[in-house]
Structure formats: C-alpha cells, structure tokens
C-alpha cells in the first residue's frame, strides 16, 4: 500500500464504516481516488456468456448499491462492475449501526438489509450511461415486506434487462429474513422458472447469474446445481457473506449479527466454489467471490474453478489501487508461467479444493 493509500485509509477509518462508505462513493463521483490503471493484456481477456471481459476481476455487488459510480469503478482497473442490490421499492434497511470493521482480521460484518433507493433511481442512472463501454451487471433483490418476493425478481428482470450486461438474482443475503429459504429446491425451482420466463419476454436478454450463500451443505449444493442446469441459468456467483464465525482475532465485534466478508471467508467460499464446479461441470459460468485481496487469492479462485472473480472488502483495507495491482499481478503470472490465456489456469486445483469438507 502506498503512502497516499495509507493516508486515505486512515482518514476514512476515522469515520464510522457507513459514513466512510458514503465518502468513498462521493470521492469516486468527483474523480478523486487515483487507482492504479489496470494493464491491458490480451492473456487476461475472458469471453463468457457472450461478453468479453478485459480482465477477470470485478467489483462485487454491495458497494455501489444505487448505480452511482460504475464507470469510476471500471476506471480503477476492474474488468467489470456489479451494482446493487436493488429492490423494486426504496427501503432504508436495518437499524444502525449495521456495518462493523474487524480490522485485525481484515474483515467486515454487515447487516444492512438491502438498503437502496429502489428500481427507478438505479434505472435512471443506468439509462444515462447508455452507449458507454464497460461491463456493468445489476444485482436484483426483493423488498423485505414484499407479499410476492418472486414477483420482485420478475420486476427486476423486466426493469433492468435492457440496461444490464448481466443480471444477478440475489437470494443469499443473510440480512433479509427468510430470503435464504428461497435457495431450497422447490422455491428455487419456481423462482428460476419465473425469472427465466421474464427474461424471455424482455426485448433484451442478458445472462442470468444466481448468487448463493456459503452456508450450505452438500445436499443443498446438489439441489441448487440441479435447478441451475434444469432451468438453463447462465452462471452462479459463489458466494455471499457467511453467518458462520471461523476463529477471529477481533474480539467482541466478531460476534455481531450479520454477514461476515473478507479474508476469513476465503477458505469456505472457495471450497463451495470448487464443489459447485464439480456439480455443474465445465460449461456453466462461475464467478468466485470471498476473501479476494491479492493476485494470488484471485488466481487461486480460478484454480478452484472460477471463470471470473470479484472483491469488495479487500479494497476497504487496501485502497483503490488494489484492483490495478491485482490485474498487474495476474499479467505477471501469465508471463512467468508462459500462459497464453488466464483461462488455462482454471480447475488446476479443483480436486484439491472440492475434496475439502464443509466444516
């Protein structure tokens, strides 16, 4: 981390996490943070689901909830950015405080609860960037008090299909009561059927990804994989935050309710990723997320079966230069290992990760 990055982090860490997040969004809107411009290397290009990603590193959903700064994020060196989660109606989310830094663990616990400005606000911003280059996905969710949560996802597809490079169906946040129950096979089957029907009726038909939780057992993973294959979903994102608590060094704050992200999530999310790759086979796209904070952790996700990777929490601790550094590290790895494409690395550690228990 550079001196400027350290100073910026120290300044932001002087504020509570939610205020710091708002300041970082405002800074990106003004063009203030200077990231490390990502190298353009043909070996890092990934063609997936009809999209050409300039590199495999993306910004995960949860940072730019209301589609305020997707182009600024791409300017930091990300190969793609995912905005949201957006719900049909605006909602305030859960009571504050609801974000907690676990600095000793380079982790965060959040219980935000899909706080966002709603479909209309996000759609207006995304419509305004029409014609600009860059891959921007939209992560869609359901309102907490909705009487028809599946209908909320249908509305999300209908609203954003023409604006999104891809859509992510997020049913894995732990902070909306009952949402994760939609991962159960019967509910999931109905959800995916209706989502795919909504896409079929849209004028534009972007790829559909399903974002799953890391807190699943083998039988649940098998059910999800079966539904993904049967309903012809384009890909999955593994994984959301975890409600489990691996050994942490951050004391009482580590016992806060909510989803844990960052470095402690890497192991379990990568095991789930590999197990899903085994279940889905080689042809379905997988985006790996959870604990990515360096070129090596990003590369290991790919070795475990990911086509693309995402990060968020890592940038809280390493600053806006992180995506550029990771992409440069990936390019150096390709050069050192004489790879013609980063895709050659995929699945090279698949058996190692897939054989680990979900403990």
Curated annotation (Swiss-Prot):
Keywords: Cell membrane, Flavoprotein, FMN, Membrane, Oxidoreductase, Pyrimidine biosynthesis. It catalyses: (S)-dihydroorotate + a quinone = orotate + a quinol. GO terms for molecular function: dihydroorotate dehydrogenase (quinone) activity. Its main location: membrane. Its EC number is 1.3.5.2. Pathway: Pyrimidine metabolism; UMP biosynthesis via de novo pathway; orotate from (S)-dihydroorotate (quinone route): step 1/1. Its cofactor is FMN. Monomer. PANTHER family: DIHYDROOROTATE DEHYDROGENASE (QUINONE), MITOCHONDRIAL, DIHYDROOROTATE DEHYDROGENASE (QUINONE), MITOCHONDRIAL-RELATED. Catalyzes the conversion of dihydroorotate to orotate with quinone as electron acceptor. This is Dihydroorotate dehydrogenase (quinone). It comes from Mesorhizobium japonicum (strain LMG 29417 / CECT 9101 / MAFF 303099).
């Amino acid at each position: 981390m550079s001196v400027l990055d350290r100073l910026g982090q120290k300044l932001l860490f002087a504020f509570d996490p939610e205020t710091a997040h708002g300041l970082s969004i405002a800074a990106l809107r003004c063009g203030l943070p200077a990231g490390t411009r990502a190298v353009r290397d043909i070996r890092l290009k990934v063609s997936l689901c009809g999209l050409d990603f300039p590199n495999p590193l993306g910004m995960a959903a949860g940072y730019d909830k209301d589609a305020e700064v997707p182009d600024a994020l791409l300017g930091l060196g990300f190969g793609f950015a995912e905005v949201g989660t957006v719900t049909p109606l605006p909602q305030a989310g859960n009571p504050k405080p609801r974000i907690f830094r676990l600095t000793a663990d380079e982790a965060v616990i959040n219980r935000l609860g899909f706080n966002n400005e709603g479909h209309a606000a996000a759609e207006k911003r995304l419509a305004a960037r029409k014609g600009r280059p860059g891959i921007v996905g939209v992560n869609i969710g359901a309102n907490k008090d909705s009487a028809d949560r599946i209908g909320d996802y249908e509305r999300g597809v209908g609203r954003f299909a023409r604006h999104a490079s891809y859509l992510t169906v997020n049913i894995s946040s732990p902070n909306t009561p009952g949402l994760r129950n939609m991962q159960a096979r019967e509910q999931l089957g109905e959800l995916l059927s209706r989502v795919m029907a909504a896409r079929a009726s849209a004028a534009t038909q972007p790829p559909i990804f399903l974002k799953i939780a890391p807190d699943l057992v083998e039988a649940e993973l098998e059910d999800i994989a079966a539904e993904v294959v049967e309903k012809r979903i384009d890909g999955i994102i593994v994984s959301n935050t975890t409600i489990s608590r691996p050994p942490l060094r951050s004391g009482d704050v580590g016992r806060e309710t909510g989803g844990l992200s960052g470095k402690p999530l890497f192991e379990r999310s990568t095991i789930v990723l590999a197990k899903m790759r085994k279940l889905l086979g080689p042809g379905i796209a997988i985006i790996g997320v959870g604990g990515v904070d360096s070129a090596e952790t990003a590369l290991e996700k790919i070795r475990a079966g990911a086509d693309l990777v995402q990060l968020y929490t890592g940038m809280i601790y390493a600053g806006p230069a992180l995506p550029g550094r990771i992409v440069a590290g990936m390019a150096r790895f390709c050069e050192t290992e004489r790879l013609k494409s980063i895709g050659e690395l995929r699945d090279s550690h698949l058996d190692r990760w897939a054989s680990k228990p979900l403990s």
